[in-house]
From Swiss-Prot:
<dbReference type="GO" id="GO:0005840">
    <property type="term" value="C:ribosome"/>
</dbReference>
<dbReference type="InterPro" id="IPR053708">
    <property type="entry name" value="Ribosomal_LSU_eL42"/>
</dbReference>
<dbReference type="GO" id="GO:1990904">
    <property type="term" value="C:ribonucleoprotein complex"/>
</dbReference>
<keyword id="KW-0196">Cycloheximide resistance</keyword>
<keyword id="KW-0687">Ribonucleoprotein</keyword>
<dbReference type="InterPro" id="IPR000552">
    <property type="entry name" value="Ribosomal_eL44"/>
</dbReference>
<dbReference type="GO" id="GO:0046898">
    <property type="term" value="P:response to cycloheximide"/>
</dbReference>
<dbReference type="GO" id="GO:0046677">
    <property type="term" value="P:response to antibiotic"/>
</dbReference>
<protein>
    <recommendedName>
        <fullName>Large ribosomal subunit protein eL42</fullName>
    </recommendedName>
</protein>
<keyword id="KW-0046">Antibiotic resistance</keyword>
<comment type="similarity">
    <text>Belongs to the eukaryotic ribosomal protein eL42 family.</text>
</comment>
<dbReference type="GO" id="GO:0006412">
    <property type="term" value="P:translation"/>
</dbReference>
<dbReference type="Pfam" id="PF00935">
    <property type="entry name" value="Ribosomal_L44"/>
</dbReference>
<dbReference type="GO" id="GO:0003735">
    <property type="term" value="F:structural constituent of ribosome"/>
</dbReference>
<dbReference type="InterPro" id="IPR011332">
    <property type="entry name" value="Ribosomal_zn-bd"/>
</dbReference>
<keyword id="KW-0689">Ribosomal protein</keyword>
């Protein structure tokens, strides 16, 4: 279980800052894949018509988790940076802080 606070004071690479400032932390989410990317256009063209599946469908999945990527936005200059964490099964953003002698809850 990884619990990350919603704000973090870290170095900002922005032209105005170039020093440690407060950053807003959010979790990165991949954008919607474009229908007009060259690979997708080629794939759709190849798939059209008769003949079934033309390219191999990947089945041998090895990983059970994904690496968590944090998106850090500077409060001062709005510059965004990304920071990857290690793999984890449970990720929480801005959850309650841990108390001593308390049982873990999911």
């Amino acid at each position: 279980m990884v619990n990350v606070p919603k704000t973090r004071k870290t170095y900002c690479k922005g032209k105005e800052c170039r020093k440690h400032t407060q950053h807003k932390v959010t979790q990165y989410k991949a954008g919607k894949a474009s229908l007009f990317a060259q690979g997708k256009r080629r794939y759709d063209r190849k798939q059209s018509g008769y003949g079934g599946q033309t390219k191999p469908v990947f089945h041998k999945k090895a990983k059970t988790t994904k690496k968590v990527v944090l998106r850090l936005e500077c409060v001062v200059c709005k510059t965004k940076a990304q920071l990857s964490l290690k793999r984890c099964k449970h990720f929480e953003l801005g959850g309650d802080r841990k108390q001593k002698g308390q049982a873990l809850q999911f």
